[in-house]
């Protein structure tokens, strides 16, 4: 097990939490997870990566990570029997090794793409030359995001390390006719369709205007959505 860097979070007061009843209800489900798959225009993202001579994979990965961090509900977990909300999420992504296996790589969040790529690139390069292996970390302050570049799929059900896991799982597929499918698994105890839709809206914004991924996020630019999008 790899010990991840210390993550900062706040404890949610469930006594006054507007979501308390929904949280309690969905936590009783045998499996409270739900999956979505949304086609998203990505031609501009591809062309931007090509023009700037950066990794299309890394640019898409960062856009997904930035969108996930922009929706508070995707940062909420249970820790020591308390509901918490992490300040920031990292991303764990599989990288193909020489033997066509894969090794998981941990990539920390960053305020803009250049910093993200500078930290992620050496890890990705090193992973390609190592033996296949999973990555088990202590903590849940991350999302899982995988690229499936060989398929342009229309649906996907993600594997779960534990039934009803709170860590969101994302997969994006092959660019076809300017569109990429982005599938996501979310825990209904924290995330409703509304919150998932806000996540996808942020993904669309990043894919449609990728130049913004080089601009550091400020508090006012945390989300392009109305203030209600940031309600707890």
Task: Enumerate the language-model features and the residues they cover.
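Flexible, Gly/Pro-enriched loop and linker segments at secondary-structure and domain junctions
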Residues: 4-37, 57, 140-173, 214-216
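Gly/Ser/Thr-rich phosphate-binding loops and adjoining beta-strand/alpha-helix segments
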Residues: 5-9, 26-59, 75-89, 168, ...
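Acyl activation and transfer enzymes in specialized metabolism, enriched
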Residues: 45-70, 180-199
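Small-residue-rich loop/turn and linker elements
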Residues: 74-106, 132-135, 218-225
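Helical lid/core segments from catalytic subdomains that handle acyl or acyl-like groups
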Residues: 97-153
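Intrinsically disordered, low-complexity linker/assembly segments
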Residues: 154-191, 196-204
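Flexible helix-coil linker/hinge segments at domain or subdomain boundaries
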Residues: 205-225
């Amino acid at each position: 097990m790899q010990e991840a860097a210390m993550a900062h979070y706040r404890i949610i007061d469930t006594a006054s939490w507007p979501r308390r009843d929904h949280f309690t209800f969905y936590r009783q489900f045998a499996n409270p997870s739900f999956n979505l798959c949304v086609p998203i225009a990505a031609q501009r993202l591809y062309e931007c990566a090509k023009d700037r001579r950066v990794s299309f994979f890394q640019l898409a990965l960062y856009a997904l990570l930035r969108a996930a961090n922009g929706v508070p509900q995707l940062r909420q977990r249970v820790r020591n029997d308390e509901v918490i909300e992490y300040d920031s999420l990292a991303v764990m992504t599989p990288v193909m090794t020489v033997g066509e296996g894969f090794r998981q790589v941990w990539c920390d969040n960053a305020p803009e793409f250049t910093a993200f790529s500078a930290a992620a690139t050496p890890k990705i390069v090193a992973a390609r030359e190592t033996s296949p292996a999973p990555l088990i970390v202590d903590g849940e302050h991350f999302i899982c995001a995988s690229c499936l570049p060989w398929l342009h799929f229309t649906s996907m059900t993600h594997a779960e390390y534990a039934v009803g896991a709170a860590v969101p799982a994302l997969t994006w597929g092959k660019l076809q006719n300017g569109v990429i499918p982005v599938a996501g698994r979310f825990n209904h105890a924290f995330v409703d369709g509304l919150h998932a839709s806000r996540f996808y809206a942020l993904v669309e914004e990043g894919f449609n205007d990728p130049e913004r991924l080089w601009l550091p996020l400020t508090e006012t630019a945390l989300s392009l959505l109305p203030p209600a999008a940031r309600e707890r």
